[in-house]
Structures are given as structure tokens and as C-alpha cells.
Design a protein with these regions (language model features):
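Active-site acidic/histidine proton-transfer and metal-coordination neighborhood
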Residues: 69-142
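N-terminal pre-domain/capping segments
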Residues: 1-85, 91
Length: 142
């Protein structure tokens, strides 16, 4: 299945899905305002998918203002909360996969420390999560 980022108007997305038989990759659940209103956001996106005419969905996890390898424990806690909210949205919407960013920035973190540090976050995050295929996306990694 090929997925197209839902970065266009819904009518344009519907035309693309209908013409090419694609699924949708949505960033809606990477946006904090949508996560703050999670139930309403899920209902709204469910309706969008219905109108667009597909149930094939990939979610892109939060990536702004969050960081799974942050030194600051409160930032990691906020990241965990946002990632869990996105995961819940994925469950309810039947997403095939959720894409998350690793948080690696070579200008801030040493690779050796980063790998050990971020592994702790991801082990905690994936504990008891078996319903989705989770993917880590490279942002700054080389």
C-alpha cells in the first residue's frame, strides 16, 4: 500500500485516494492541540476518513516540542504522554502503523550516550503495546 501525506485539503486528498488507491499518512495526531482534545479529534478524523473514502491510515507521531532522549525528565514525561495519546488515536482509528522520530540530534547528543538513553524511553513506551507496527523515523541521524 502506498500512503500519501494528508497535507492537502480534504477534497484534494479524496481525489488522490480515489485516483491512485492510496492510503493516508496523517500528521493530525502529532499536533498538541488535537491531542489536547483527543476524543473530539478522533471523531473528527474518523469522519474525514469516511468522507475521503479510505480506512488505510498511517499516523505520524508528535515531533514538535517533544524528545524521547531529552535530558530533562519533564520533557521525557511530556513526550511519553503525547506518544501514548497518538498511540491511542491509532488504536481507535485502526492505523496500520505509527511513525515516531527518534529525537537524535548529533549537535546535542553523543551517539553512545544517546543510544543507551533513548533505549530506556522506547522500552518503557512499547511495554504492553502489541497492537501496532511502530516505526522510528530519522530526522538528524547520519
Amino acid at each position: 500500500m502506498i500512503y500519501i501525506s494528508h497535507l492537502v485539503l480534504d477534497d484534494e486528498m479524496k481525489a488522490l485516494v480515489n485516483e491512485y488507491g492510496t492510503g493516508i499518512e496523517s500528521i493530525d495526531f502529532s499536533i498538541s492541540d488535537n491531542l489536547d482534545q483527543l476524543s473530539d479529534s478522533i471523531k473528527t478524523y474518523w469522519q474525514k476518513m469516511k468522507e475521503i473514502g479510505t480506512r488505510d491510515l498511517i499516523l505520524h507521531g508528535p515531533f514538535l516540542d517533544v524528545n524521547p532522549c531529552a535530558y530533562d525528565s519533564l520533557v521525557r514525561e511530556a513526550t511519553m504522554t503525547r506518544f501514548n495519546q497518538c498511540y491511542e488515536a491509532g488504536l481507535q482509528l485502526g492505523a496500520k502503523k505509527i511513525v515516531f522520530h527518534s529525537g537524535m540530534n548529533p549537535y546535542v547528543y553523543y551517539k553512545e550516550y544517546w543510544a543507551e538513553h533513548v533505549a530506556k524511553f522506547w522500552k518503557k513506551f512499547i511495554k504492553n503495546k502489541t497492537e501496532h507496527y511502530l516505526e522510528m523515523d530519522a530526522g538528524w541521524e547520519k
